[in-house]
Amino acid sequence: MAQFLRLCIWLLALGSCLLATVQADCSQDCAKCSYRLVRPGDINFLACTLECEGQLPSFKIWETCKDLLQVSKPEFPWDNIDMYKDSSKQDESHLLAKKYGGFMKRYGGFMKKMDELYPVEPEEEANGGEILAKRYGGFMKKDADEGDTLANSSDLLKELLGTGDNRAKDSHQQESTNNDEDSTSKRYGGFMRGLKRSPQLEDEAKELQKRYGGFMRRVGRPEWWMDYQKRYGGFLKRFAESLPSDEEGESYSKEVPEMEKRYGGFMRF
């Protein structure tokens, strides 16, 4: 007896679930018919739903609606919503891949994952640069003290994640073009500039030369140098003789070329 009651309860629960599913499908189909008709009043929505569910003896309205659905099924906009979304996502990914080359293949999934884990709140949009810097841990950040560099990385990340503004990007591109030379000189201290430099940058270059000039410079010759000479015969002998000795260092420093003076022995072997 207990098993029979349990079976009846399960049948009632299953029947109610199936009934709810059928009712939802019937309501959706009747709504499509009303949308497709030029005059929605031609079909009674309630009668169509009841006939679809089998609660009315007549099936005239439901048969008409079913024929209409079979004829005009591909024309309903909500049937192709998923297809439109997929095509739009593919177009956006194609444009980003075309614009940034292989950058999105390497880091696109990383930034999208971080954007899903840490969504930006509306009140935090004003400080977008700081939030992006905290979120990505300095990713794409060259110099934390430069506002232009941080703004550049912020705009790039916003554009890749779909949160940028076109007008803001256009205005910022104009400003970054005007300040490109200043940011380059600040970042590299005249490294990428030509021979003509301002006195202030010249003084900064001299200070850097005094501080880091001989940092990478070798003192004397390493022990493995003789091993290379023995192994390769006299192949490296000419290059070894061209290097100045410790005694000739002072006289050699007076004759170094302009490149050596500028970078303070940084490029010297």
UniProtKB/Swiss-Prot annotation:
GO terms for cellular component: axon; axon terminus; cell body fiber; chromaffin granule lumen; dendrite; extracellular region; neuronal cell body; neuronal dense core vesicle lumen. Residues 165-191 are annotated as: Disordered. Its main location: secreted. Disulfide bonds join 26-48, 30-52, 33-65. The keyword Nuclease does not apply. Keywords: Cleavage on pair of basic residues, Cytoplasmic vesicle, Disulfide bond, Endorphin, Neuropeptide, Opioid peptide, Phosphoprotein, Secreted, Signal. GO terms for molecular function: opioid peptide activity; receptor ligand activity. This is Proenkephalin-A. Pfam families: Opiods_neuropep. The lineage of its organism: Eukaryota, Metazoa, Chordata, Craniata, Vertebrata. One of its GO terms (biological process) is positive regulation of behavioral fear response. Residues 1-24 form the signal peptide. PROSITE patterns: OPIOIDS_PRECURSOR. Belongs to the opioid neuropeptide precursor family. The gene is Penk.
